[in-house]
Regions:
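Short segments within alpha-helical structural elements
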Residues: 68-93, 244-300
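Periplasmic alpha-helical coiled-coil/stalk elements that build and connect Gram-negative outer-membrane
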Residues: 3, 7-120, 223, 230, ...
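Amphipathic alpha-helical coiled-coil scaffold segments and their short linker/junction regions
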Residues: 91-156, 161
């Protein structure tokens, strides 16, 4: 039914907004953890500068990185609030909706072949086609003869005549009878026009359904391709990039504090570390959003 199509679309919109809020919360956590590392970097740079071990340029670079990251944190806060406002509006709440997940995780998806007829869109289309076929049958009824049935009866109470009426015309006494009439249409022009219009409407609906089925099939294949690509990216950043990012941040701070690498090298390490973590979150969000699109196309809730 149309209600099922609308309900599925609304539920999918809510899910998409919810997991977008979860993603924005994950980005905020990454940036806030990076802010902690940059604060340590700035402290070390300041100590080394005061001790005369480095030039002021190193301290200025550390301060710049920390300020830039704080601006990114502020922007992430705003993006999270925007996502939460959208989610609150979709669920009809006046309060801010907080994601319950502490971290961004991949959604479950079981691969299945696409069958348009089993989706809410397909079922609604089938209902529309049945209704159009019924309209054709109703229009054809105008060619058939019409039957009418009426009941006639007479009841005379001989002992009661308060108005002293002449009852000679009722000498037949009491009786009950039926009358049956048959109406045969003599002109079929209007009926033919109705049948033609109903058939045309049925053909248009059938063509529209066929086009929609092809479009949904293309959307499914496109979404499947995007989902597989996003999963490959997520797998890399989750299995290799995440571990590498953590090791880079820890090892870089240790080597910099011991003077084994320059501040420029450490800046590159920090930048690559946060890029890997943010790319992991972005790839995972892309994958989850693709899963939600697949669920909507397949009619899953």
């Amino acid at each position: 039914s149309k209600a099922a199509v609308v309900r599925l679309s609304l539920e999918n919109d809510v899910k998409a907004a919810y997991y977008q809020a979860v993603y924005q919360a994950e980005r905020l956590r990454v940036l806030e953890s990076q802010d902690s590392l940059l604060a340590q970097y700035r402290t070390l740079a300041e100590k080394r500068y005061k001790a005369g071990e480095t030039r002021q340029l190193e301290l200025l670079s550390a301060e710049r990185l920390q300020r830039e990251n704080k601006m990114e944190v502020l922007a992430a806060h705003n993006e999270l609030e925007t996502a939460q406002l959208l989610l609150s509006r979709l669920v009809g709440s006046v309060e801010t909706v907080e994601p319950k997940e502490d971290s961004l995780l991949p959604l479950d998806w079981k691969q299945a072949s696409y069958n348009y007829s089993q989706t809410p869109d397909g079922q609604y289309s089938a209902d529309r086609l049945k209704a159009s076929e019924q309209a054709v049958r109703v229009a054809k009824n105008g060619f058939a003869p019409s039957l009418s049935l009426s009941l006639r009866n007479q009841l005379v109470i001989s002992s009661w005549n308060p108005y002293d009426q002449d009852r000679s015309r009722f000498d037949g006494g009491n009786f009950m009878g039926f009358e049956v009439g048959v109406g045969i249409p003599l002109f079929y022009g209007a009926t033919r026009a109705k049948v033609k219009a109903a058939r045309k409407e049925r053909e248009m609906i059938a063509l529209e359904i066929k086009e929609q089925e092809q479009l949904r099939q293309q959307e499914y294949l496109s979404a499947l391709s995007r989902m597989n690509a996003a999963y490959v990216r997520y797998t890399y950043y989750n299995e290799e990039g995440r571990e590498r990012s953590d090791k880079m941040a820890e090892q870089g701070l240790l080597e910099y504090s011991q003077g084994e690498i320059s501040y420029l090298e450490y800046m590159n390490v920090l930048q690559e570390s946060i890029d890997l973590r943010l790319k992991r979150a972005s790839a995972l969000n892309d994958y989850n959003q693709c899963v939600l699109v697949m669920e909507k196309l397949c009619g899953r809730q």
